[in-house]
Amino acid sequence: MATANGAVENGQPDRKPPALPRPIRNLEVKFTKIFINNEWHESKSGKKFATCNPSTREQICEVEEGDKPDVDKAVEAAQVAFQRGSPWRRLDALSRGRLLHQLADLVERDRATLAALETMDTGKPFLHAFFIDLEGCIRTLRYFAGWADKIQGKTIPTDDNVVCFTRHEPIGVCGAITPWNFPLLMLVWKLAPALCCGNTMVLKPAEQTPLTALYLGSLIKEAGFPPGVVNIVPGFGPTVGAAISSHPQINKIAFTGSTEVGKLVKEAASRSNLKRVTLELGGKNPCIVCADADLDLAVECAHQGVFFNQGQCCTAASRVFVEEQVYSEFVRRSVEYAKKRPVGDPFDVKTEQGPQIDQKQFDKILELIESGKKEGAKLECGGSAMEDKGLFIKPTVFSEVTDNMRIAKEEIFGPVQPILKFKSIEEVIKRANSTDYGLTAAVFTKNLDKALKLASALESGTVWINCYNALYAQAPFGGFKMSGNGRELGEYALAEYTEVKTVTIKLGDKNP
């Protein structure tokens, strides 16, 4: 995602981006059915559910509502596609990579359409959907396409007359449950490495945001993937999500979402067939600003770090620790940034903040804002909803926040910036680590020794130094503690989608 340091999520910073097209406001939704075996199906139950535009609260369309029988049908298709001798299994690794490249080409071709669908369904600014979400999808697909024919085992030295080596083989049918904050991007983070390694998939998009996943199904067929390799079942967590998590013929599941639901997914996986689990869960991420930091950079990065995507990021800079010498100035500048942040119509290219995803999330954020006021934090700006029919909340900044306040402990997932004060490095390390989460952290300092000390001491899967949200397809991403298990992206993701097999051969005793 774009930040003040020039990094782009899942990409290289030196690539010239395409021109921003005119957004398509009233896009016709073509794909609303369940995608199994490269065909479109109605749900077994005949039920449908509505997906709505959070900017207007108006219904976009109705989507087929999957349930356990639909998941069973999808798993059966994925099993058949994975059988030895199937068209998918007969493909060599280079051809698998070529298919992923073809899918990336199609996503790039339809980039404006996918970005418009994402904006309609999530309320995120079209500017961000086009340049960040879709850019990340394309780069992730191309990155793992390149890995397809480079997954290798090792030769292991043993005794004389014995040859021992390892093979990295696909797991089989993999499930994926994706969130509503980055619907297509989080799907691609799972799909690309799984297909690169030769697996088949059953996917459940978030019920709030199913449209880009279903559109991708049409591109998967167009790219030439054999039937059954990718299957997409829209529906709800307690039905489709539970069926995928507990299905005895699904061998691995990847989930991105809340820690609460992640626990349920892992429990269901263990109680069924001990399927392998990758979890990318919540975060209460510390952003540490030292007195010697470049304050302009720190203020801008912390601002983007918490307000990007309406604050609906697992990586959000939701605890900003500022050294006391620069605390007042940091707060002053942060308030200036927040007051100037453009909030409104996500199809307006000047907009940087759209609505929250739904009424439930909207109400939760406002309740946490009220808790901050009641518990003694100083409201510097914002603190209420916008006067609009959509689910918009004013960018909110709190100062004089203490560690025991709810806004400093709970994942807000909204446009709220709590700013805390610290006196020493040892103090801020202890306070930053005093959470059940451990997804990301950031440090702003000009002192290399201090930066490396903090990077080593912070209990987080990712630590950014003098930047924020600098995510790349090449670099692994995942959490410590209750922020999850396993890693997505980078070479490390390949291990999540392969089984290691040891082959040992006893040679004859006779000399040649």
From Swiss-Prot:
Catalytic site residues? 280 (proton acceptor), 314 (nucleophile)
Q: Where is this site: Transition state stabilizer?
A: 181
Disease tied to this protein: Microphthalmia, isolated, 8: A disorder of eye formation, ranging from small size of a single eye to complete bilateral absence of ocular tissues. Ocular abnormalities like opacities of the cornea and lens, scaring of the retina and choroid, and other abnormalities may also be present.
Function of the protein: Catalyzes the NAD-dependent oxidation of aldehyde substrates, such as all-trans-retinal and all-trans-13,14-dihydroretinal, to their corresponding carboxylic acids, all-trans-retinoate and all-trans-13,14-dihydroretinoate, respectively. High specificity for all-trans-retinal as substrate, can also accept acetaldehyde as substrate in vitro but with lower affinity. Required for the biosynthesis of normal levels of retinoate in the embryonic ocular and nasal regions; a critical lipid in the embryonic development of the eye and the nasal region.
- Reply yes or no: does the keyword NAD apply: yes
Question: Where does it mainly reside?
Answer: cytoplasm
Q: Which reaction does it catalyse?
A: all-trans-retinal + NAD(+) + H2O = all-trans-retinoate + NADH + 2 H(+); retinal + NAD(+) + H2O = retinoate + NADH + 2 H(+); all-trans-13,14-dihydroretinal + NAD(+) + H2O = all-trans-13,14-dihydroretinoate + NADH + 2 H(+)
Q: How does it assemble?
A: Homotetramer.
Alphabetized GO MF terms: aldehyde dehydrogenase (NAD+) activity; aldehyde dehydrogenase [NAD(P)+] activity; NAD+ binding; protein homodimerization activity; retinal dehydrogenase activity; thyroid hormone binding
Which pathway? Cofactor metabolism; retinol metabolism
Query: Which residues, renumbered to this chain, carry the PTM N-acetylalanine?
Result: 2
Entry GO CC: cytoplasm; cytosol; extracellular exosome
The UniProt record lists the EC number as 1.2.1.36
- What are the cysteine partners in each disulfide bond? none
Q: What is this protein called?
A: Retinaldehyde dehydrogenase 3
Residues given in the record as NAD(+) binding sites: 204, 207, 257-262, 361, 411
> Region labeled Disordered — which residues?
1-22
Q: Which family does it belong to?
A: Belongs to the aldehyde dehydrogenase family.
Keywords of the record: Acetylation, Cytoplasm, Disease variant, Lipid metabolism, Microphthalmia, NAD, Oxidoreductase
According to its UniProt entry, this protein's organism is: Homo sapiens (Human)
A Gene Ontology biological process noted in the UniProt record is: locomotory behavior
Name any one Pfam family assigned in the record: Aldedh
| Location in the cell | Cytoplasm
Tissues with expression: Expressed at low levels in many tissues and at higher levels in salivary gland, stomach, and kidney.
